[in-house]
Amino acid sequence: MGIKNLNSVTASLRGTVLLDKSMLWKGKPEKSLVSYKISCGGRNSRGVITVRHRGRGHKRLYRIIDFKRNKVGVSATVERLEYDPNRTAFIALLSYDDGEKSYIIAPNGLKKGDVVISGEGSDILPGNCLMLKSIPVGTFVHNVELRPGNGGVIARSAGTYAQLMSKDGVYVLLRLSSGEIRKVLSDCRATIGIVSNLDNQNVKLGKAGRNRWLGIRPTVRGVAMNPIDHPHGGGEGKTSGGRNPVTPWGVPTKGKKTRKRNKSSNKYIKRVSDKG
């Protein structure tokens, strides 16, 4: 794919950098693989805001993605690559030899007409899915399972990956794109390759309206609020907040570790993320 640097014809286009989607499918998604998605705007069933800065956004259809890849031994041809409004990665529509269709997260380099397959003994090619114990050390993978058969949960967003570092009995060591090194059961499945849309990190939306299309509402600074609304609020004139940065609920922020020290999964993490 790539990115588009737009000319400054208007103020909202100045500095705008968008994704080039010219190589993606321009029609509607596969009808049998979509479902309606009702946006809740960050509210719960009582109408109370539980997640701030969430809005309605543009209407979307949810694409049903096959994260399990449990159709073993049946080859599938890539019909097309599509944009998915529900995630940063692109998706690929597969047509299996037995007539079934499914969506998968598209790895970088996958193109229309490629053949992919899931199962042991598959070639180490982008889009093929194998157990971690069957993948050579040093290979980049994505859509990695944490529990065998439950479907991939690690490395699913644009440009992410996990690199297989070593094998140790029933476990393998994976280095994630965040720098974290983690133990995973060798019977878990993973898909070969790095997730597509590597240029997503270079996108600059250019105007507030594009954020609203994505369902993101404005974020108000605490020092601009009243004392009732935020610990940094109030004061005469402009103030600095008067204390170390905290959330609206008084929890230290900007670098404060929030992970529980006694979490059961700590024993599987050999090195924490470089990004905190």
From Swiss-Prot:
Key word RNA-binding present: yes
Gene3D superfamilies hit by this protein: 2.30.30.30, Nucleic acid-binding proteins, Ribosomal protein L2, domain 3
Cellular component GO terms, alphabetical: large ribosomal subunit
Keyword Translocase carried by entry: no
Matches recorded under PROSITE patterns: RIBOSOMAL_L2
Domain of life according to the entry: Bacteria
Compositional bias segments (type: Basic residues): 254-270
Any Pfam family matching the protein: Ribosomal_L2
Family per similarity comment: Belongs to the universal ribosomal protein uL2 family.
Annotated NCBIfam families: rplB_bact (TIGR01171)
Complexes and interactors: Part of the 50S ribosomal subunit. Forms a bridge to the 30S subunit in the 70S ribosome.
Protein name: Large ribosomal subunit protein uL2
Source organism of the structure: Ehrlichia canis (strain Jake)
